Amino acid sequence: MKQYDIGIDLGTTSIIIATEEQGVVFRQPTIGAVDTRSNTIIAVGDDALQMVGRAPAYIDLVRPLRDGVIQDHRMTNELIVRFVNEVCRSRIFKPRIAVCVPAQITGVEADAVVESVMGAGAKQVFLVDEPVAAALGAGLQIREPHGCMVVDIGGGSTDIAVISMGGRVKAASVPVAGNAFDRCIAQYVQEKFQIAIGPLTAEALKKQVACCTKSEFEGVMEVRGHSWETNLPARHVIYTRDLYEPVQELASRIAASARAVLESTPPELAADVSSSGVLLTGGGSLLRGLASYLAGELHVDVAIAPDPLNCVARGTAISLSEGRYLTAGFRDATPKAWHKCLQNNHDPFAGE
């Protein structure tokens, strides 16, 4: 019987599972609900997300990952076990599982991911550098001696890398991504209009109204929240121009990190990037005007990958068949092989 392989994008906002043959087969929010009276997990994924802003005081809503790193091991284990079992419930044999992790992850942080995935019943576990997975999922020919640059903007972090001959040459990770834009928008609305809005409303503003460039778009949305002046429900109309300042401030931090990576890239590879441009992946890449803003800051063409939300998950699944061609950015993390790797080098993705 054919070996069953799955790839997991263990994201701060969503967990996405894919196979090379079928593409994305499962997606759920990375969130769980705990009844603090009994310390039991009562809901995960979509069921827990519906409780945001509406749950009683004894229900604790937990987002177990922050900036792509596990913060709550118990909830992470629960999510992975439930979701993997959902995908593999009709399978007799244990799957091989590849999981993407941030480019700058430490050995200790990676070990926590390995432990959680092994707990879900994996036969073997492989870790994939997130920018490498994004490039594979976007269809880039990363095995060639040609430099390509990927900026993967997820929920918790933005991973940036220049890749050539199957591995990353230069990389950086910055804790500015989709969730940071949501928090920034909520804080700005509160300070400017004296209205407190919830995270779901802030996310809706980001998707429907926010833009990184002044002249590219003008949208409008009425928001409802809690007035800080009257302590009563309130509403206010928000325009794109109202959000330009906070959104561009965060976008400039992504641009600065991308510029630093590009400036430290060897000249020949930098010339390749100048010729082929930069590819954006991840849900954060869909922020209106971000691609054109980055193009102006980096002085190279910037494009959004087709189906950017699923590039990392799809590439993670593909890595299981392409792993032997990847010089760095792919590691057998099954405990015996993994501990040997960590003993030899603290960087989980350093070359042999």
Protein language model annotation of sequence segments:
Residues 1-153, 161-278, 285-312, 317-352:
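Nucleotide/phosphate-binding catalytic cleft detector across ATP-hydrolyzing
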